[in-house]
């Protein structure tokens, strides 16, 4: 709606400049206010239990399963975009201030950021890389139907396909980008500062981060749950 209003405002100004409508009419049109977007929810996200279910749906007895487990873990625990997961190299994984991080990741708009990574995610990465016997280059590689390495990297679409496979398996309707939203939402509900979430996601504006979060609305603790009305069955 706001985009359409903006186009109408521009059209009114051009019409006034070309003498097609009165200047006062154009001025009135330009003063029409747009709709505020506070609280808008973009996409979907998982609860903590759903996130755990998704990661645990992988098969730890296969090379592909270990890889996919690490992919899901890193996306949910760091908020990396699927393209960033595909681009992730061993050089990115470093220790800073006594903890594991994904260092100097170049993201959207060529913005460089460092993202803290929990130890349990590092464990899943180690399990994958040690089983695959890889120590440098891209962290995530293609695995063929014989459960053997078949390439030295993965595409962004391949990362999306991994997420879809386990989302369908777990009965969850979501995309790879929804795991990024899940990271933001779970971190916020756990008490993380919005600014720190913004920095880790690489958002230029806090407004974008707040839209990920749905502002401060908590659908699991809704006002309607406190009304107390019980109807006869």
Positions of predicted regions on the chain:
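Conserved catalytic core of the tyrosine transesterase superfamily
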Residues: 1-233
């Amino acid at each position: 709606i706001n985009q359409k209003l903006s186009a109408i405002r521009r059209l009114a100004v051009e019409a006034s400049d070309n003498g097609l409508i009165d200047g006062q009419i154009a001025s009135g049109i330009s003063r029409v206010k747009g709709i505020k977007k506070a609280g808008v929810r973009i996409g979907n996200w998982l609860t903590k239990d759903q996130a755990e279910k998704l990661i645990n749906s992988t098969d730890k007895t296969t090379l592909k399963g270990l890889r996919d487990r690490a992919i899901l873990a890193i996306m949910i625990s760091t908020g990396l975009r699927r393209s960033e997961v595909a681009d992730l190299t061993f050089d990115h994984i470093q220790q800073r201030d006594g903890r594991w991080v994904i260092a100097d990741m170049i993201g959207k708009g060529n913005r460089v950021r460092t993202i803290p990574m929990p130890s349990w995610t590092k464990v899943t990465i180690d399990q994958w890389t040690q089983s695959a016997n890889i120590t440098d280059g891209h962290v995530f590689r293609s695995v063929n139907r014989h459960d053997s390495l078949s390439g030295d990297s993965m595409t962004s679409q391949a990362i999306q396909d991994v997420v879809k496979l386990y989302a369908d398996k777990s009965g969850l309707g979501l995309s790879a980008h929804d795991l990024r939203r899940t990271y933001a939402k779970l971190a916020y509900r756990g008490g993380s500062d919005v600014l720190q979430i913004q920095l880790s996601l690489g958002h230029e504006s806090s407004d974008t981060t707040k839209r990920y979060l749905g502002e401060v609305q908590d659908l699991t603790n809704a006002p309607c749950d406190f009304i107390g009305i019980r109807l006869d069955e």
